[in-house]
Amino acid sequence: MTTMISVSGLSKDFVLHTQGGVRIPVFAGLDLDVHAGECVCLHGPSGAGKSTLLRSLYANYKPSAGHVRVLHDGGMVDLTSAEPWQVVEVRRRSVGYVSQFLSVIPRVPALDVVAEPARLLGADAESARDRARELLRRLNIPERLW
C-alpha cells in the first residue's frame, strides 16, 4: 500500500509566553502512517489533542519535535522542515483540511463546495464536478446530500 502520510516522533507543546514560558504538553512521540484508501478516525475526549494533531499535519502548527511527511508529486515532503512555498503547494494539490467549524453558504450544493479546489487549479466545471462526485462516492456520502 502507498503511504500517503507518515508521522514519526511527533510532539506538540504550547508555550504560554505571558506566563513565564510555561509549557503545556499536548502529545508526545506520536507515530502514524496513513495509506491510500484508508479511513482513519481520531477518537478521544475534548482536549485530548485531536484538532492540534490535525493542525500539525496540515502545518498550521509547528510541532515541538518529530516529522510529518506527505506524499506529493511522487515523493515525501516533510512539512516540519519544508519551505513555505512547498507547504502551499502540498496544500494546494495533495492534502486538505476542513475545520470542524466549517461554515458553508446556504443553497450551494456540497458537490460544488467539493469541486471548488479543482476549479481554482484550472479544471473546467464539468471535470471538477466529476472528480467531486467520485470523491463523495468514495466517502459513501449519499447523493441526496450533495
Tell me what each language-model feature is.
Residues 21, 76-96:
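ABC ATPase NBD coupling module
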Residues 5, 27-29, 90:
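Conserved structural motif at the start of ABC-family nucleotide-binding domains
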Residues 66-78:
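Conserved ABC transporter NBD signature motif
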Residues 43-45:
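The feature captures the beta-strand-to-loop junction immediately N-terminal to the Walker
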Residues 58:
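Helix-to-loop junction immediately C-terminal to a conserved catalytic motif
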Residues 78, 126-144:
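Conserved ABC ATPase "signature" region
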Residues 108-117:
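Short coil-to-helix segment of the ABC ATPase nucleotide-binding domain corresponding to the Q-loop/switch region
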